[in-house]
């Protein structure tokens, strides 16, 4: 089953489980799965319990429902993701020795 098929099936569920994994959380909130660690690092999402770095992270559906309806939180989350990529691209440019105009 492809990711798109899993996502479509998940989004068609009428009753969600009490906890969702990172991919399901991303689909539910309207983000990409690779953006969930960025939101955790920005302290905008908190996984259940105290999972180890390499463990599967789960999130409470009840909390996600509240965040999903919070326009201010969605704006902060979107800004955090944009800031992450802005910083990462700036590091990449500075490591490559390029100036802002693309010249060396």
List the model feature ranges, each with a label.
Residues 26, 45, 96-98:
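Compositionally biased, low-complexity repeat tracts
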Residues 61-104:
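A short, Lys/Arg-enriched interface patch at domain edges and termini
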Residues 34, 53, 100-104:
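Intrinsically disordered, low-complexity, compositionally biased regions/tails
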Residues 1-2, 54:
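A detector of low-complexity, intrinsically disordered, Ser/Thr/Gly/Pro/Ala-rich segments
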Residues 18-23, 40-75:
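Short helix-start
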Residues 27, 57-58, 83:
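Intrinsically disordered, low-complexity N-terminal regions enriched in serine/proline/glycine
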């Amino acid at each position: 089953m492809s990711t798109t098929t899993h996502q479509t099936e998940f989004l068609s569920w009428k009753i969600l489980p009490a906890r969702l994994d990172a991919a399901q959380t991303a689909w539910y909130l309207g983000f990409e799965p690779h953006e969930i660690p960025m939101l955790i690092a920005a302290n905008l999402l908190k996984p259940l319990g105290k999972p180890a770095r390499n463990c599967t992270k789960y999130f409470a559906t009840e909390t996600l429902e509240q965040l999903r309806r919070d326009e201010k939180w969605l704006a902060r989350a979107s800004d955090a993701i944009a800031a992450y990529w802005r910083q990462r691209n700036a590091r990449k440019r500075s490591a490559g020795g390029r100036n802002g105009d693309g010249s060396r």
